[in-house]
Amino acid sequence: MTLSASLSPQPFGRIVTAMVTPFDSSGAVDFQLAARLARHLVEQGSDGLLVCGTTGESPTLSWDEQLKLLEAVREAVGSSAQVLAGTGSNSTSEAVKATREAAAVGADGALVVVPYYNKPPQEGLEVHFRAIAEAAPTLPLMLYNIPGRTGCHIEAETVACLMDCPNIVSFKAASGTTEEVTALRLACGSRLAIYSGDDGLTLPMLSVGAVGVVSVASHVAGPQIRAMIDAYVEGEVGAALAQHEQLIPLFKALFATTNPIPVKAALEINGWSVGAPRPPLSSLPEAMRTTLSNTLSALRQT
C-alpha cells in the first residue's frame, strides 16, 4: 500500500536541498563551483534547490551576489530541478522587491521567512506575506517558520487566513515539533504542502502529513534521504525507519553547532572546496570535524 494518495501535492518535489554558498580563497562567491555543486545535488536525488537561504548564508550576501547566484544555479540545472530563491526580509518592502526580482530572473519559487528581530504581531505577519504574494502573483511561495532564529512564530490560524492567496502553496516547518504540521493541516487542509525544515524530523513529520524536506544533509546523503522518503511513501515504514536510524548520527553531527558551519566542513571532507563561512560565522572546531569525518566514513559503509 502506498501513502501517496493521502498526502498533499508536492510543488517542489520531495527533497529540496538548501544549498551552501561556495566561496573562493579570497572570500568571494565562487559561481562556477556553485553551478557544479547544483548539478551534483540534482544527480544525488534533489528535486529542488534553495539558493540563498539560511544554509546559503544570505545574511552576509549582498542582493547583487544573491541574484547572480540564483542565475548561475538556474542556468546550471535547467529544467532538471526546481530552483527556489530565499527572498525573505524583516522589511516588507525589501521582501517584495527581492521576490519580484527573483521571479524576473527565472526562479521557480521563493522561500519567504517570517520577519526576524522586529517581532511583528500576527496581524502584521498576514499583511507582510499577503503583500509579497500579491507582488509576484505567478511565483509559488513557501512560507518559512523558524522561531529559534527569528524570534517570531507564525500561527497556523494566520497561515489559514492567507490561503486565499493562490501562490502561497507550501510551508517550511522548522519550529522543532511535529505538532506544527498537525496544526497547519487542521487549519489549512491538504491545500498547503508542508516540508520539514529539520532533517532529523523528516520521517516523523511525514507520518503526520508533511510531503518532504528542505534538507541540509542531502549535500552529503541525498540517496539515503531519498531512499527513506520513498520507502515511507510506498508504505515500507520499517525500511524507512531503518534508514532514518542510520542517518541520525549524521543529522546530529551536521547540527552540532550553527548551520552551515558543519555542512561546509562535510563538503570539504568529501572533496568539495566550498570555503569557510563568512564572518561572523567561523570554521568547525577540530574535535567536531573529527566526529563529522568519522560519521561520514561510517555512513559510506552502510
UniProtKB/Swiss-Prot annotation:
The active site is at Y144 (proton donor/acceptor), K172 (schiff-base intermediate with substrate). One of its GO terms (molecular function) is 4-hydroxy-tetrahydrodipicolinate synthase activity. Keywords: Amino-acid biosynthesis, Cytoplasm, Diaminopimelate biosynthesis, Lyase, Lysine biosynthesis, Schiff base. The record marks T54, Y117 as: Part of a proton relay during catalysis. InterPro entries: Aldolase_TIM, DapA, DapA-like, Schiff_base-form_aldolases_AS, Schiff_base-form_aldolases_CS. It holds the Pfam family DHDPS. Signal peptide: none annotated. PROSITE patterns: DHDPS_1, DHDPS_2. It comes from the Bacteria. The keyword tRNA processing does not apply. It catalyses: L-aspartate 4-semialdehyde + pyruvate = (2S,4S)-4-hydroxy-2,3,4,5-tetrahydrodipicolinate + H2O + H(+). It is found in: Cytoplasm. CDD domains: DHDPS. The keyword Amino-acid biosynthesis applies. Belongs to the DapA family. Homotetramer; dimer of dimers. Catalyzes the condensation of (S)-aspartate-beta-semialdehyde [(S)-ASA] and pyruvate to 4-hydroxy-tetrahydrodipicolinate (HTPA). This is 4-hydroxy-tetrahydrodipicolinate synthase. It comes from Synechococcus sp. (strain CC9902). The gene is dapA.
